[in-house]
Amino acid sequence: MVFTAKSPKINIDEVRSLSKLEGQVLANKLQRDQELEAIIRGEDQRILLVIGPCSSDNEEAVLEYAKRLSKLQEEVKDRVFMVMRVYTAKPRTNGDGYKGLIHQPNAKEAPSLINGIKAVRHLHYRVISEAGMTTADEMLYPENLPLVDDLISYMAVGARSVEDQQHRFVASGADFATGFKNPTSGNLNVMFNGIYAAQNKQSFLFLGKEVETTGNPLSHAILRGALNEYGKNIPNYYYDNLMDTIAQYEKMGLENPFIIIDTNHDNSGKQYMEQIRIVRQTLINRDWNEKIKKYVRGFMIESYLEDGRQNEPEVFGKSITDPCLGWENTEALVREIYQRLGE
């Protein structure tokens, strides 16, 4: 086993001093965090949208998107609450490909994780301070959470990480909403065991110290579809899937039951335009069944400035990872959600 150090040990306090929220910007973030918590707890009946690019590969494109989203948020704020996806670390099935801003702060240059950490904080800071949007990120590397936990408002534990004990235990110490995706197998027990672990106190080693957490009552479920043994996607946003998920929630007696539908990934088969239909179908299911309306109160939507995806970062605001809805389709979908909720 050989590890070669490529930098001095990172000083967490020094990193956190960069791009620090203060004054009115901090106050605005804390206010929005309180609103988000009320939504997860069921005290606020607005629909939650965790929405934005699959990956945040270009700072200026992400900022342009954030400013448009902020304007739209103001128009729909009485029925819809949006947290912007600013995903800076991407899981790769075989380790190849673009791994996110934290690895590669410039998608056209060689990886540099030290500069990547600074870029991640700077981007979250700019979205919050310049656009007024609070942000979501994926906890791909649990040990990196202290580098950004003062900036983010929502955290997702992905399908490949949900069974990992370290991810579950670190999530139990987070003081913000944390969504657990079902694994790629579709096994709901794995997801619910993760939520249970995160909602309870845990003791473990973290960053070289023995720590104890309080438990995170804002941990909840994200349904993202599954893959069968032949690699075919199996959606799990259908009516029966939702009723099964609700039954499991009720059986386990978890706090603050809350279900988000991930409209892309294996629910859409990465056919990005399918996200629109999945939202529509879920809203119909909410109308049909009061339990679904009570439990299913959020969507995760992948969108950017331009429709689709590209292999290289050539078109401004077009994804270089999974395909996304472009801005025109995004705006139309959010307005449609808003109108449907008012009917």
Task: For each feature predicted by the language model, list its residue ranges.
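Internal helix-turn-beta structural module
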Residues: S303-L341
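Active-site-facing alpha/beta catalytic cores
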Residues: A66, R79-D244, H265-K270, E274-Q281, ...
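N- or domain-start disorder-to-order transition segments that initiate the globular core
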Residues: M1-R41
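Conserved phosphate/anionic-ligand binding catalytic regions in large, soluble enzymes, centered on
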Residues: L48-A61, D322
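Conserved, mostly hydrophobic/aromatic
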Residues: G52, I261, G326
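Redox- and metal-dependent alpha/beta enzyme cores, enriched for Fe-S-associated oxidoreductases
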Residues: T245-E250
